[in-house]
Amino acid sequence: MLKPGDPGGSAFLKVDPAYLQHWQQLFPHGGGGPLKGGGAAGPLGAPQPLQPPPPPERAEPQPDSLRPRPASLSSASSTPASSSTSASSASSCAAAAAAAAAAALAGLSALPVAQLPVFAPLATVAAEPLPPKDLCLGATSGPGPSKCGGSGGDGRGVPRFRCSAEELDYYLYGQQRMEIIPLNQHTSDPNNRCDMCADNRNGECPMHGPLHSLRRLVGTSSAAAAAPPPELPEWLRDLPREVCLCTSTVPGLAYGICAAQRIQQGTWIGPFQGVLLPPEKVQAGAVRNTQHLWEIYDQDGTLQHFIDGGEPSKSSWMRYIRCARHCGEQNLTVVQYRSNIFYRACIDIPRGTELLVWYNDSYTSFFGIPLQCIAQDENLNVPSTVMEAMCRQDALQPFNKSSKLSQAPQQRSVVFPQTPCGRNFSLLDKSGPLESGFNQISVKNQRVLASPTSTSQLHSEFSDWHLWKCGQCFKTFTQRILLQMHVCTQNPDRPYQCGHCSQSFSQPSELRNHVVTHSSDRPFKCGYCGRAFAGATTLNNHIRTHTGEKPFKCERCERSFTQATQLSRHQRMPNECKPITESPESIEVD
């Protein structure tokens, strides 16, 4: 950094008057008055030194200390300097370097300068090697010691301009090495490539939607991306926002449907779409895959037709709603409304839970007896869209159980709120209004919803009594009651049903006693008299009459009986069973 010294130095520059005028405009606040471009500035021995401008962070020099020398003095003063050729050459180089440094500091390198002569003493000092740290620019007016901050021959202090080597290098060459680093305002474009169109677009794909929707459908896991499951139709992009496609938790199945948001209890999903098949075609064995097959019944419980959703191009996304393996994971039940199949949420389904459907809690309808659910409210809203929550009160009245299931079907009343929230819907088919006569009764302001009997085809398709087949694991049973016990872990009130007729019993012993009435032959014969009996228990009781064995003994009176029923009747009689008492001992009196 250049620092001003004491006045009276011997080194000065002859500067053009235009340069001085511009200098005065840059520093108008100086305390020494205006700069003057010509005229004598005092005697030759005491010229005013030229002080280059400091950088903005340093103290500004006083303008009145800058006094240019006249032209006559320049030529006269240059006479002593012409004594040595080498010194003149060195002084020219040093003066050029000092002028370039001053111009770089003031930012005035474009201003014209007439000539830059310096005195010989300055050249002598500048020709010396630069010090390692500080550079001293100046001269002495006479012989004497020449060092920074020293004194000349006249005893006065010699002005020195001090700057470090780093500062000089910065002001001379620093701006040439400066590089402007532009701000990286470029942001990478999002990946808008549509994998289905195989095309890069500026925005989202107009046909297949944004990329996040595709990720929501096919999943983002590496396993799913490495080996995607087959059978991905194009219409899967039409999934409603309430659900999304997922990997099914049921073993052996690729896809499933899970809840994308919380689904309230009572939400209706449907209708189920598929191909209508006549019962004769299904019973003939033309349909091999019955996994997506539903039955439609009329008001009398007669099978009308089947809805087959096995073909993806003619069905909807509801075909991927799988059947529950047990009652614990079931969250949807099947409801038939007129000639359509709907799924209804029987519990609140959390987000991320797979939708699994199964039959309602009355499995009697599963075996050929359709239930009639009578809605007590005329304002029953049946959705026509894919999914609509109806916000109903789930107050279900108990069944009106009949003693004989073969004579009259059970009835179940579903109570809906008087002011259902949401929107009102009218169920319309593509071909027009649905038939209004189906599932309606004569009672005013009541509507009948027949629950579907998905495997009541066991009544017709598997007419033979030993071919009862499970719709989940395809396991066959010899009796329908065995299939019923296999399907439902919570048995109804009468789970034991006769394989020869439609009667059912609550205890297995009652069923065994009833089965004997269907058989005319008596396979159990007595070995003593040859009499035949229908049951083994009856034969054993008869044999005791020949042997005289009485294994049943009363603990009170110690009487024995042949059958347990005889002992029970004996204990119930008040006067027949008397405890045995010992006679009192006789007392001898002397």
UniProtKB/Swiss-Prot annotation:
It is an enzyme of class 2 (transferase). Its EC number is 2.1.1.361. GO terms for biological process: methylation; negative regulation of smooth muscle cell differentiation; negative regulation of transcription by RNA polymerase II; neurogenesis; regulation of gene expression. It comes from Bos taurus (Bovine). It holds the Pfam family zf-C2H2. CDD domains: PR-SET_PRDM6. It is found in: Nucleus. It catalyses: L-lysyl(20)-[histone H4] + S-adenosyl-L-methionine = N(6)-methyl-L-lysyl(20)-[histone H4] + S-adenosyl-L-homocysteine + H(+). The gene is PRDM6. One of its GO terms (molecular function) is identical protein binding. Residues 241-360 form the SET domain. Its main location: nucleus. Keywords: Chromatin regulator, Metal-binding, Methyltransferase, Nucleus, Repeat, Repressor, S-adenosyl-L-methionine, Transcription, Transcription regulation, Transferase, Zinc, Zinc-finger. This is Putative histone-lysine N-methyltransferase PRDM6. One of its GO terms (cellular component) is nucleus. It comes from the Eukaryota. Transmembrane segments: none annotated. A zinc finger (C2H2-type) spans 468-490, 496-518, 524-546, 552-574. SMART domains: SET (SM00317), ZnF_C2H2 (SM00355). Coiled coil: none annotated. Interacts with HDAC1, HDAC2, HDAC3, CBX1 and EP300. SUPFAM superfamilies: beta-beta-alpha zinc fingers, SET domain. Residues 25-87 are annotated as: Disordered. Belongs to the class V-like SAM-binding methyltransferase superfamily. PANTHER family: HISTONE-LYSINE N-METHYLTRANSFERASE PRDM6-RELATED, PR DOMAIN ZINC FINGER PROTEIN. Residues 29-42 have a biased composition (Gly residues). Residues 71-87 have a biased composition (Low complexity). Putative histone methyltransferase that acts as a transcriptional repressor of smooth muscle gene expression. Promotes the transition from differentiated to proliferative smooth muscle by suppressing differentiation and maintaining the proliferative potential of vascular smooth muscle cells. Also plays a role in endothelial cells by inhibiting endothelial cell proliferation, survival and differentiation. It is unclear whether it has histone methyltransferase activity in vivo.
